[in-house]
């Protein structure tokens, strides 16, 4: 006889416990496997120095949840996000303010995503800034550290020349842009 076995395979836990478990484990990936120099999210646990721009945005949001839920302190979260922002600002190659899909987390150099994708990636940059803008809103205390972080995020956000990435002056943005192709 064929059919679906609908017996429980795992222990049932209350919804709140499940939410906590998912949030904690998601956060742990970004926290534990963040690049030691840049703080950015690695593409995979086995990717060495390759970090991902969009994944870093997801990681920043996970850090905000972790601070709010008490998995880490607010200070730990602000320090890691500032580390990422400083790396983006001082070390990374930016293309009219936008970043590549993949970056070398030790040097800031663009790591080509494919043969002709060796420049800006607006989708990944957008995902990164979703996290950073959420951090800018979350870290709203009137302290020197949080004020500096907000100012740095704002400066990077405003440095993106979205208009430059318009396709032939139309109301369409390029997804990828390469300095070579």
Where are these regions (language model features)?
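Surface-exposed patches in mature extracellular/periplasmic domains of secreted proteins
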Residues: 38-43, 72-77, 142-149
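Extended ligand-binding clefts on enzyme/binding-domain cores
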Residues: 8-9, 16-17, 97-126, 141-181
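A structural signal for well-ordered alpha-helical segments within the folded catalytic domains
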Residues: 24, 28, 54-57, 61, ...
